């Protein structure tokens, strides 16, 4: 059974590995369905992550800052003017509106034309909004000029990358595998390498077309020019906001000024009285200075990132991402395709890497590329070999795999002449549990059942007596009865109910087992292990399994069989059954006659040797032997008082033959037998 379970686990593992390898290597119909669904849900990304970061830094962040300034101006008054106390409400509103429009600091003793202006504080939010719109112009030009051509190029590239992998997996790799298998097991590594190199030289027309396409893209630079122009334009346009914001941050520090309202209206008409001056304050100046500083730092940082990216892209970058993996699928990328780094291959490689979720075979291609020490064909060949091995009809032998299944019928202690242990090749089948006629024996917790019975009768504990001479005398009789029953069973019987299979008997008694054995208290004395006599035969069931009083009288001493004679069939009303395997041997419940009969025959060695075997009325043993003292005490309780002998001679005397039937209850399954003296 252990070997069968191991075999089942090995086959399940092999099947699972085969399915995984099949999904890994061969393209299936699920790829086409997934590709069609992905084409509907996913769109090509025509902007790189770096370009999105630049757009956010130069456009979106300034717009957010402008929104913050406008929110503050609308939430509270943009200017505070402290008018004289004799101004009415309308006069105060007029003074505040006039000063917010004028925004000129009326310095005393200075000509009015030379008064400094604070108009930049009012214009700054609108300037930031204009700068954000200007910085979005390069991204908008890239969207209009390069999106159409870039979309067509990417669609062709992504589809061809998938096709290249599929052609290699379906065509070239199986072809190499067949050629290697045709050489036989004696093929060398050099021959394998030659087969792989010859297969690499054989290319399909589609592969040649794709290589020509890559070569042409390596010599053109249209997309490279557009990409470079986009970022250079960003650098040039960013100079304007940086210059303006730097000037504003350096010069516009004043947030309080004096506003000249003109002559007082209360003065005489036509007279030039003193002008009225009002002190004013701009509360948003500090916030605008902070926003200007943040915008300056952000634009400078974006320009630095753009410069580093352009230098890396067109000067120092050597990797082409996805195109570097094409040599694993038979597409040879040549460096002479690129006359310089300033070509479309670099731009297309970045966008293919960004749209790699459209490549259905990308994970398989990455798996092959990670095996840098092996060529693609060697990797696929090994995977296909493992797939074929998992689909084989027999279990891999010792040479095919490191797992072997040794024949369980072979004794490992006996050395065999062969060098290798025998290996059993079993066909691959679905394992099913087949019930047999000889089920495994279940453990029988006898001691636990005895403890439960003893715990249920704690109200009247019985003292434990020592082993008496009567126990010693009964033991040979029990052995003789067991031997007689065994002899009778071996001699054969009728072909009726006695031919019931033992398995059914075991199931039956296991099903009807009960622990309700009142009113006895069972002892936990274990049987001797030196001599194991055969099990006593058991009757069928308790329903009608006891003899009536007339049948008991009809048996008598004359019907008792001798020591060696088999028991007649009429003395056993029911066919016998073997005892349960979990019970101790000879563990029947025997009932003896009470010591009230006046028998004076003394014990002697001669009488002991000629003792007749007992007439057997047995049941399947469910508990160990009842102590004989317990049976005497039970009889004394039924008669109303103890019947102790007057002297030791009465204790050792043998009572006349009398058959007493115990276990008048219905539920428990016990063994009842008679003892004759």
From Swiss-Prot:
Report keywords, A-Z. Answer: Cell membrane, Endoplasmic reticulum, Glycoprotein, Golgi apparatus, Ion channel, Ion transport, Membrane, Phosphoprotein, Transmembrane, Transmembrane helix, Transport
The GO molecular function terms of this record are:
gap junction channel activity; protein-containing complex binding; structural molecule activity
Give any Gene Ontology cellular component: Golgi membrane
Q: Where does it mainly reside?
A: membrane
Tissue specificity note: Expression is enriched in central nervous system. Expressed in suprabasal layers of skin epidermis.
Q: Where is this site: Cleavage?
A: 416
Stated membrane topology is: Multi-pass membrane protein
Q: Which domain of life is it from?
A: Eukaryota
Q: What does this protein do?
A: Ion channel with a slight anion preference. Also able to release ATP. Plays a role in regulating neurogenesis and apoptosis in keratinocytes.
The protein's name is Pannexin-2
Species per Swiss-Prot/TrEMBL record? Mus musculus
């Amino acid at each position: 059974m252990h070997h069968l379970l191991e075999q089942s686990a090995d086959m399940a593992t092999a099947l699972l590995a085969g399915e995984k390898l099949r999904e890994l290597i061969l393209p299936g119909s699920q790829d086409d369905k997934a590709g069609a669904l992905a084409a509907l849900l996913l769109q090509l990304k025509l902007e790189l992550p770096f370009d999105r970061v630049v757009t956010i830094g130069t456009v979106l962040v300034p717009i957010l800052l402008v929104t913050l300034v406008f929110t503050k101006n609308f939430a509270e008054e943009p200017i505070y003017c402290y008018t004289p106390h004799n101004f009415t409400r309308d006069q105060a509103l007029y003074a505040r509106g006039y000063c917010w429009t004028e925004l000129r600091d009326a310095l005393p003793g200075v000509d009015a034309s030379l008064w400094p202006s604070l108009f930049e504080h009012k214009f700054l939010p609108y300037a930031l909004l204009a700068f954000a719109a200007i910085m979005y112009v390069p991204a908008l030009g890239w969207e209009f000029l390069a999106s159409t051509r870039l979309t067509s190029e990417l669609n062709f590239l992504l589809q061809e990358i998938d096709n290249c992998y599929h052609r290699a997996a379906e065509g070239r790799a199986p072809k190499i595998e067949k050629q290697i298998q045709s050489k036989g097991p004696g093929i060398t590594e050099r021959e394998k390498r030659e087969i792989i190199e010859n297969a690499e030289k054989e290319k399909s027309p589609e592969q040649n077309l794709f290589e020509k396409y890559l070569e042409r893209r390596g010599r053109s630079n249209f997309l490279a020019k557009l990409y470079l122009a986009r970022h250079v334009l960003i650098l040039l346009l960013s100079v304007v906001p940086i210059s303006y914001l730097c000037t504003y941050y350096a010069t516009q520090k004043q947030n309080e000024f004096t506003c000249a309202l003109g002559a007082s209206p209360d003065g005489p008409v036509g007279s030039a009285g003193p002008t009225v001056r009002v002190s004013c304050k701009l509360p948003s100046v500090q916030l605008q200075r902070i926003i200007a500083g943040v915008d300056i730092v952000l634009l400078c940082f974006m320009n630095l990132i753009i410069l580093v990216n352009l230098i890396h892209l067109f000067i120092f970058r050597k990797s082409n991402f996805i195109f570097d993996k094409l040599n694993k699928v038979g597409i040879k990328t040549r460096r002479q395709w690129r006359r310089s780094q300033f070509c479309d291959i670099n731009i297309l490689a970045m966008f293919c890497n960004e749209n790699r979720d459209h490549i259905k075979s990308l994970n398989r291609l990455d798996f092959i590329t990670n095996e840098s020490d092996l060529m693609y064909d060697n990797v696929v060949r090994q995977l296909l070999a493992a797939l074929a091995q998992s689909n084989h009809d027999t279990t891999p032998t010792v040479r095919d795999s490191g797992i072997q299944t040794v024949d369980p019928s072979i004794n490992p202690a006996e050395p065999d002449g062969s060098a290798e242990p025998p290996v059993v090749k079993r066909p691959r089948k679905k394992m099913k549990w087949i019930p047999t006629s000889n089920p495994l024996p279940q453990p029988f917790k006898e001691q636990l059942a005895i403890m439960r019975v003893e715990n249920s009768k704690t109200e009247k504990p019985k003292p434990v007596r020592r082993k008496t001479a009567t126990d010693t005398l009964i033991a040979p009789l029990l052995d003789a009865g067991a031997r007689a029953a065994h002899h009778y069973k071996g001699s054969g019987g009728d072909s009726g109910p006695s031919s019931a299979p033992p398995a059914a008997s075991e199931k039956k008694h296991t099903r009807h087992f009960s622990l309700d054995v009142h009113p006895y208290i069972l002892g936990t004395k274990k049987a001797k292990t030196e001599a194991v006599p055969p099990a006593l035969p058991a009757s069928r069931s308790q329903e009608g399994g006891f003899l009536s009083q007339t049948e008991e009288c009809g048996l008598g001493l004359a019907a008792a069989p001798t020591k060696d004679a088999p028991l007649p069939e009429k003395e056993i009303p029911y066919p016998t059954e073997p005892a349960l395997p979990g019970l101790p041997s000879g563990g029947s419940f025997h009932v003896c006659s009470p010591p009230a009969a006046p028998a004076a025959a003394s014990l002697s060695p001669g009488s002991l040797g000629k003792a007749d075997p007992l007439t057997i009325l047995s049941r399947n043993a469910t508990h160990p032997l009842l102590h004989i003292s317990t049976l005497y005490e039970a009889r004394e309780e039924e008669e109303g008082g103890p019947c102790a002998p007057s002297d030791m001679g009465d204790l050792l005397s043998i009572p006349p033959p009398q058959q007493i039937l115990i276990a008048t209850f219905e539920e428990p399954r016990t063994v009842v037998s008679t003892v004759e003296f």
